[in-house]
Amino acid sequence: MTHPVVRFAPSPTGRLHVGNVRTALINWMFSRGQQGKFILRIDDTDLERSTAEHEEALKVDLTWLGLTWDDSFSQSHRFANYDAAADKLRALHLLYPCYETAEELDVKRKIAQTRGRPPVYDRAALSLTAQDRADLEAKGRKPHWRFKLSGERVEWNDLVRGPQSIDTASVSDPILIREDGSYLYTLPSVVDDIEAGITHVVRGEDHVTNSGAQIEIFMALGGKAPEMAHTPLLIGADGAALSKRIGSLSMGELRARGYEPMAICSHLAKLGTSDNIEARATLEQLCEEFSFSKIGRAPARFDDNDLNALNAALVHAMPFEAVRERLITLDARAASEPFWLAVRENCTFVADAISWVDMVYGSPAPLVAEEDREFISGAAMYLPEGELTTESWSAWTNALKAATGRKGRGLFMPLRKALTGAEHGPEMSAVLPLIGREKVLQRLS
């Protein structure tokens, strides 16, 4: 295989969310795994909705995820290229003007459906004479422009779906240019793919039906159609569409909630594949494990619980230096290596460490049941002498077990509740030296 050249083409009209990040990630893993090239194309032909702020935000999101790009360009700087391509198609009699209004087209669709025919455009505009067109324009009508499909069957081997074909006689000639002269997605995308040397187009399966027309436009413009891979769309754990949750699943929102970039990437890389959903420490590992052959045909279920589990697994393994600056920002008291190592396995997010600060450095209210009061008040005399270490908890509880006959939960739980004010938490062997002898004695008294 030659080194692939792929592109991720977001529109700067909103924040990146898990759906389009998954597309970016699959493109990135495939290209990087084959020593290829990953291009970021900004699809900003919608000048009214596209903003510089959203473009900057999506670049920040991709950088945060580690999905760096080799080249980048914006479609808004390339209108002359699209105009030239449109002129070429006109010269080939493959781009023709149509004057129907949206209402008239809707009536045509409804009539076709009532007659049991597919709602395919009838190409009435091809019958217009030059005088007909002049008369319509004199009445204020402005044309939209359609690409004339061949009517033949277009075939390709999809890297995910296998052999695919589209009968272009069964679909409408696609509109490439609107009445106001602005371009729809199709023509600029094909022009850019040809000029950027894109070898593989990887996108969601909602684009499958567009592929036949796009392949014919590639051929008409003298280009070679890239290989294609159409991946199943994401759905929620309940099987419902994610569209209503997209705001809460934006990269900005997930980052603010404390998710690690590699948790998100691990989750999205493994969703809908034959691999187990497990955390990976680096993008390079994900690249090594990626293959289109692993992607299934069923919709991929995005489950918050899986994402939380992956995030927790990564947090549990994080060394102190990886989180030091974040802990300082959250609460300087938490920014010590012994504290982090003691609490990290009780954290789903790095910020969860702060919930354990008061247990160690504050004054939590002891929880002492009436039947445990005598045991707790007498426990102090068995506390090992000198500075407390990670070995002190075991020595202390063994001494208490021998002296009182208590064992198991009846021994450990009253001590934990008296010292931390909680029934659950980090390992007491790590917590005891953090609390320190003086505070341990205070909390037992």
From Swiss-Prot:
ATP binds at residue 244. InterPro entries: aa-tRNA-synth_I_cd-bd, aa-tRNA-synth_I_codon-bd_sub2, aa-tRNA-synth_I_CS, aa_tRNA-synth_I_cd-bd_sf, Glu-tRNA-ligase_bac/mito, Glu/Gln-tRNA-synth, Glu/Gln-tRNA-synth_Ib_cat-dom, GluQ/Sye. It is found in: Cytoplasm. Gene3D superfamilies: 1.10.10.350, HUPs. One of its GO terms (cellular component) is cytoplasm. GO terms for biological process: glutamyl-tRNA aminoacylation. SUPFAM superfamilies: An anticodon-binding domain of class I aminoacyl-tRNA synthetases, Nucleotidylyl transferase. PROSITE patterns: AA_TRNA_LIGASE_I. Its EC number is 6.1.1.17. A motif ('HIGH' region) lies at residues 10-20. One of its GO terms (molecular function) is glutamate-tRNA ligase activity. NCBIfam families: gltX_bact (TIGR00464). HAMAP family: Glu_tRNA_synth_type1 (MF_00022). This is Glutamate--tRNA ligase 2. It comes from Hyphomonas neptunium (strain ATCC 15444). The gene is gltX2.
